[in-house]
Amino acid sequence: MRTVTWNPEVYGRYSGERSRPFVDLVSRVATEDPTRVADLGCGSGSLTAILGERWPDAAVSGFDSSPEMVAQAPTDLPGNVTVELGDIMSFDASGYDVVVSNAALQWVPSHRELIDQWADTLASGSWLAWQVPGNFDAPSHALMRSLAESAEWRERLGGVLRGPEGVDSPVAYAQRLQEHGFDVDAWETTYVHVLAGADPVLGWVRGTGLRPVLDVLGEADAPEFERQYSDLLREAYPATAAGTLFPFRRVFCVGRKR
């Protein structure tokens, strides 16, 4: 898996829009008294705090592989919440009552096998819940891939970006959990964000999907790629007096082990 460098400040510019799927996800985890809760790919832990507030008697652990993100963990986290460096691929689900992952598994090519592993490991009555972006066919990502594979950029960026095959449908994820003895609630939602400012879609993807490109190109060449990419985005997502409409599909799966 390619290592991605994260910029907490850039990622956090749309924190309100990014937090809503997390809240929608965990609202479907219908348990009142878990003892141990894990948040995988927690970033700075600002959303992990929600889990600590919801389950004040649980030990809530947030894990993220980005030192930059973990270093930005809020100083006022609930006392039952910790945020630490940890790799999703080496996470051991043993002993956890709730395992949550929000907008992280799409970065892990082997995440399907990890889901199988966690599902086998979790005890009866435990919960496994995740959300992944399902917008890899959207113009924001399709145009990025097309530009990266163009003659000008292919030599440096060919194969850097993931395609739609990186995540599954709600049905496929539901079937996967059912095979491991889970009762499943799976769905998809398209959030239509109204973004303000100049080139807001570029500003959004700078914090997530564009990171692999920026890491490869570096400060010398990234601005030229962004210039070409932003021209394409303005046509695909025209600005209006009320803002720029940015549809964003997300895929959710929540399961309780019987």
List each model region and its residues:
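Conserved Class I S-adenosyl-L-methionine
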Residues: 3, 44-46, 164-258
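A short SAM/SAH-binding and catalytic strip from SAM-dependent methyltransferases
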Residues: 98-111, 134
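A short acidic, Gly/Pro-enriched loop at the edge of an enzyme's catalytic core
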Residues: 89-99
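Helix-to-beta-strand junctions that scaffold the AdoMet/dcAdoMet cofactor pocket
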Residues: 108-109, 122-124
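Conserved class I S-adenosyl-L-methionine
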Residues: 1-33, 38, 46-50, 69-72, ...
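Class I SAM-dependent methyltransferase SAM/SAH-binding core
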Residues: 36-40, 44-91
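Conserved catalytic/acceptor-binding region of the Class I
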Residues: 112, 127-196
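Short glycine-centered segments of the SAM/dcSAM-binding site in methyltransferase folds
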Residues: 36, 126-127
